Amino acid sequence: LRPSLGLSSRAGIIPFGHTQDTGGPLARTVEDIAIVLDATVGFDPADPSPAASNGKIPRAYTAFLKRNALKSARIGVLTEFFGTAPEDREVGDVVRHALEEMKAQGATLIDVAVPNLSTQLQASNLLTQELKFYLGDYLKKSGGPVASVEELLGSGLHAAQLQGILDIANNTPDDYLAGDDYKRRLAARDALAKAVIKVMDDNRLDSLAYPVTRRIAPVLPSGNQIGSNAGLSAQTGMPAMSVPAGFTVGGVPVGVELLGRPFAEPTLIGLAYSFEQATRHRRPPIFSGRESAGPPAEPPGADAVAFDVTATGAFTVPARFRFDSRTRGLGFDIQPSASIDQIGGVYLARRVKRTNGGVAPILAKTGPTPPTGARSLADNEVAALKTGKL
């Protein structure tokens, strides 16, 4: 559940942006969501934003766990968020089937559209613009080794996947929050929220429904998630709950998102619980958790190469690597000079210009024995390895 902006305290959350940061529960069941929500909502003097929720918090969210909540519910199907590309069809089919299951439980489905939705989402996005200031302020106050986004980038010790967003944030003008563009985007956020609520009011809807993402989760490590619909809740401050909708033919889990009016978490909990109890789409992962995180063990190809590297830092860490371009697997055997218990992690870094392009962990602290293992390399990591930049 992503709660309404202002329902719960943000104190202690590493911030991305003032206009859309909110913390909510992630759980296996809707009942667990309601239990955690009861324990975490309300005013906190360390964060004045929950004052907006005064008078809007029920005595107990668990009271809305009702199996018949879908009966007579009116759900707006936000058709634009299903996408039209062939790659969108697989997820869309699963979510449409889930909506038919809601209909079978008594819900009425109404196809709806928010005027100029794509344009409004683009005009109201503030994630990268605010990141420089709010994350930077957090880093400065934390007393850690870096005190700004610029210093974080300079260290090269950020997750490689964040390179793009951190670059954009770092290039935001220092006076941006006092400028006209920021004011326009704030106004656009208000306009977007009003447009969504108008659609819900005009059609007497209890919620909107759409895929959490339009496409299936990508194959790691080189895939990037495409087609996220998370921006609507984030940029309006309205609550949204993702519920298991089923699985693709290939066994990939798919979620349906239910969006409600501000502080309508009780409604979302009821609808989600009713759907969950009727369908039981969630099932435990098919893996045990004991499998290796690296690529499967295979005989090395003819073009496999081995090389030695010694990393220096607080400790000396000599390592032997084996790279097989056939499988893109990078095997490693690390023999640190200190006890493995004293090492928090060993990382691969990709050099970009004069700084690193972020880091990817190849080793987490695993025990007292010298670690060996393997991981698959992403496309940019393979290219960096071949040019001496990994």
Protein language model regions, located:
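Structural helix-boundary/capping segments
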Residues: 1-76, 84, 96-101, 105, ...
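Short, surface-exposed loop/helix-turn segments at secondary-structure junctions
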Residues: 53, 180, 203, 212-231
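Short helix-loop capping/hinge segments that flank enzyme active sites or metal/cofactor-binding pockets
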Residues: 64-80, 129-197, 244-253
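General small-molecule cofactor/ligand-binding pocket signal
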Residues: 108-113, 241
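Small-aliphatic-rich amphipathic alpha-helix that forms the alpha element of a beta-alpha
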Residues: 119, 195-198, 221-244
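Conserved acidic residues
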Residues: 206
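Metal-centered catalytic cores of metalloenzymes
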Residues: 298-346, 350-390
